[in-house]
């Protein structure tokens, strides 16, 4: 509900899905959806609260001036900076924490991001659409089904409104009784509860903006930004909100149009040999990983420096930090100055293979990755030289979470699934299985799936049919689980038990994956 780019900054981490990984939320679902505490009976009507809010938000930022903001940032135990350039509805945000930086923005309706390795990509903004749905519901005076005034907060001198429309964000807005500004927002994302407070509002370009914003999630991760300077540039330059140029992180040998990767296929997973410093390690070729991930043992052996510290969560909580790897070699390919997440990787595809890392988003984003499981082939191609096979189907991918989400049909339902080469089992959400009428067709007892921090349960089922890109698979077995699959707005994770039926080319540059049925 806050117009400011700073106020609406999403505290969101990319999904990381590993071999045979299901992600389940740590907090209990009931606690996540509980009403805020400390409320008393409401002293106004919902209509009055909406009118108060609208009076405070009657204007939007114009394109007559660029709003320039500099903030002091505290995040992940690190002090940094946060800069915002805003021109009308367009904005560009830059977060800097020590030697690491990333940017996000909106340009003419297109969401974009430059990640910590300098790769720029656009994405549909499916999670932002949830926020927009809730915003419209709150501001729609006729919607009293999805919006409720649930009480007053004496601690914040605010009215508290619950907003929970279908396809929207479940949130609680604390509307200040005097100003009509939102002073606190609690919301649910990935089955985790977030609380954001907004303080010290000031009028900027006719719009009230906070000067201090603090967000804490239910794991205790915290981000706080305090305004240092805010100014208006009356001679706006559209370049202030432009996308930055993208950096290339994968270096190919000269005059080579394809590089075969040093890979072994173990239990359906592509295990690639990666040289880091003077050590050789096994990494998963993992489209389901939202970045490059390395095990802490590699950091220790190579004497790499760590930056920041936070808690992650899948099946349990675990510490994670970041590092910069001077060089990684994958066959004839080189990656230099790579920012990686440091997370313990507990998977062993077989008795003699210990996975020490994941080749995720950056590798897939800067090379066309070709996988043919039937031929035990994995290769990387320079994007500028790639030509899609004439007999392949093209399927659009969405990179909101730095993982390839596609439209698919399972049973009788259409859904959104992630193509995950780092998982050897396919998992669908229980709600999606019910919608597709394939949940009751159980063929075996409950199974256990291991992930970061522990295990979860899943139930095998048989699908009458499954389709991606016009290619149908019939009578396949998949798992069904009532679990968080690592990101919001996803109905399933398609693992290599399904993907092995395809010859695949991942082309993130054009947001496309090319598929054809594998020849046997």
Locate predicted features.
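Short structural boundary motif marking the start of a folded domain
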Residues: 65-67, 159, 259
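A cross-family detector of function-defining hotspots
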Residues: 74-76, 150-152, 316
